[in-house]
């Protein structure tokens, strides 16, 4: 997947409509985690230094097509100004005469932030009129919001019908690592899939089984696979309606020569609580009434040896109830194995990101994806609308 990026186009003097993902956690008007804003800075700087007029657009929260005062992007503009060391003017809307006039007055290297695009109902409906009004502001569309690339909205896909579209640096990195791992991985290629439910990851597992050498399963979903193999799982979470599917997936792995790794031991608890009584047991010895809440130390050891010997590893989803320290050992163990792997290590969004941060090894990962749902759909092999509209590199 080879898409044009801002490195491949002339930016000097050009008006650039850049879609970013500034949907950051905020409490009482204070940003509590600015990761997404910081992630967009290299792209913004690159365009500023190249002499572009940078028009930033983002959604924030779910205002459902209404103006919601608490969902204005004013705190984001202030924070971005301090990160860039340059004043970023925040406009009161994202379309209309005032916006057009403000863009008209821009000089090369200027940056403005449009108001929350989801204040307009047309954004999520991919309304052509709204998309046209965005396109009218600029000469070029840059998509740097991988986190919303799975949505065909006016500011992520619709706008590209009317002006040329290329990737920002963050989007370029996502396509390079996520796309590269899935289309042309260095082998052995290992995927680690965790999380509570099989149903959330069916399409991911099905797609990965056509690509990987090893597939590691953990988290609550492992219980369903264990029960499908005939193990008693006590009071553990299980999707009884997915037992046949689990058997089918295991059969597919066998047919394709994929090594499927399951827990050999688990940490069980007498109830679902941080202070529950817990013990480590083999998977054929889960006591009646107890529940598996994490993978055990022998399992971590086995997973570790496969991970460190891999040339490409993609991870999505925790190995246990890692929000509770008592059941975080398996997830932390896998995070440390990823850090010890000298190959390409990719964290496919969601809870796994929090896990590598908790383990203190985030810096050692090759790539941490910024997309939750987008990463998941990418791993499912779906074409993402926000990526599909970008110009191909010939």
Swiss-Prot record:
<protein>
    <recommendedName>
        <fullName>Phosphoglycerate kinase</fullName>
        <ecNumber>2.7.2.3</ecNumber>
    </recommendedName>
</protein>
<dbReference type="GO" id="GO:0004618">
    <property type="term" value="F:phosphoglycerate kinase activity"/>
</dbReference>
<feature type="binding site">
    <location>
        <position position="201"/>
    </location>
    <ligand>
        <name>ATP</name>
    </ligand>
</feature>
<feature type="binding site">
    <location>
        <position position="118"/>
    </location>
    <ligand>
        <name>substrate</name>
    </ligand>
</feature>
<keyword id="KW-0324">Glycolysis</keyword>
<comment type="pathway">
    <text>Carbohydrate degradation; glycolysis; pyruvate from D-glyceraldehyde 3-phosphate: step 2/5.</text>
</comment>
<keyword id="KW-0547">Nucleotide-binding</keyword>
<feature type="binding site">
    <location>
        <position position="36"/>
    </location>
    <ligand>
        <name>substrate</name>
    </ligand>
</feature>
<dbReference type="GO" id="GO:0006094">
    <property type="term" value="P:gluconeogenesis"/>
</dbReference>
<dbReference type="GO" id="GO:0043531">
    <property type="term" value="F:ADP binding"/>
</dbReference>
<feature type="binding site">
    <location>
        <begin position="59"/>
        <end position="62"/>
    </location>
    <ligand>
        <name>substrate</name>
    </ligand>
</feature>
<dbReference type="GO" id="GO:0005524">
    <property type="term" value="F:ATP binding"/>
</dbReference>
<keyword id="KW-0808">Transferase</keyword>
<keyword id="KW-0067">ATP-binding</keyword>
<feature type="binding site">
    <location>
        <begin position="21"/>
        <end position="23"/>
    </location>
    <ligand>
        <name>substrate</name>
    </ligand>
</feature>
<comment type="subunit">
    <text>Monomer.</text>
</comment>
<dbReference type="InterPro" id="IPR036043">
    <property type="entry name" value="Phosphoglycerate_kinase_sf"/>
</dbReference>
<feature type="binding site">
    <location>
        <position position="323"/>
    </location>
    <ligand>
        <name>ATP</name>
    </ligand>
</feature>
<dbReference type="Pfam" id="PF00162">
    <property type="entry name" value="PGK"/>
</dbReference>
<comment type="similarity">
    <text>Belongs to the phosphoglycerate kinase family.</text>
</comment>
<feature type="binding site">
    <location>
        <position position="151"/>
    </location>
    <ligand>
        <name>substrate</name>
    </ligand>
</feature>
<keyword id="KW-0418">Kinase</keyword>
<feature type="binding site">
    <location>
        <begin position="349"/>
        <end position="352"/>
    </location>
    <ligand>
        <name>ATP</name>
    </ligand>
</feature>
<keyword id="KW-0963">Cytoplasm</keyword>
<dbReference type="InterPro" id="IPR015911">
    <property type="entry name" value="Phosphoglycerate_kinase_CS"/>
</dbReference>
<dbReference type="InterPro" id="IPR015824">
    <property type="entry name" value="Phosphoglycerate_kinase_N"/>
</dbReference>
<dbReference type="GO" id="GO:0005829">
    <property type="term" value="C:cytosol"/>
</dbReference>
<dbReference type="GO" id="GO:0006096">
    <property type="term" value="P:glycolytic process"/>
</dbReference>
<dbReference type="InterPro" id="IPR001576">
    <property type="entry name" value="Phosphoglycerate_kinase"/>
</dbReference>
